[in-house]
Amino acid sequence: MELNWKKTWMVLGLILVLGFGMRVYHLGNNAFVADEFLDMNSAYGYFKTGEWKAWDFNSGQSSQVNINEARDERANIYKWQVAELFRVLPPTEATARSVSVFWGVVSMLVVFWSTLVFTKRKEVALIATFLFAVSVAGIIFDRRLRMYAMFFPAYLAFATTV
């Protein structure tokens, strides 16, 4: 039985809702870990000052001694998105990580498209998308404040088109 496009879009929509729900569920319950602190400091510093400087939350100002200066300019496109989100939402763990959740949903769409390009089968593309949507590694990847959640769909889309 071959799926028509209407059913395909409906199933894909359900998979996207499921994947989004699994990524956003209790998103702000855990404190930042490892490099998430550095990205939050940099994004918040840009939000407050318009410059790529780490923010010192203890003193409430940009860091005077910026030992991570070179790192503050990494992944500016990603951290700019986080900083822009702070204009409309409070600067919390959930708000900052929601940029990665967004890119996780984009990743699901790119997985569907890429699989469809290579296999020409909607069923296989839906299965691949579902497996990525419920994958523990994919969920963890898309719940961290890290630029890699944005890079994954970009690289997969590029690799598919080349």
Briefly describe each language-model feature range.
Residues E2-V162:
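Membrane-integral, polyisoprenol-dependent glycosyltransferases
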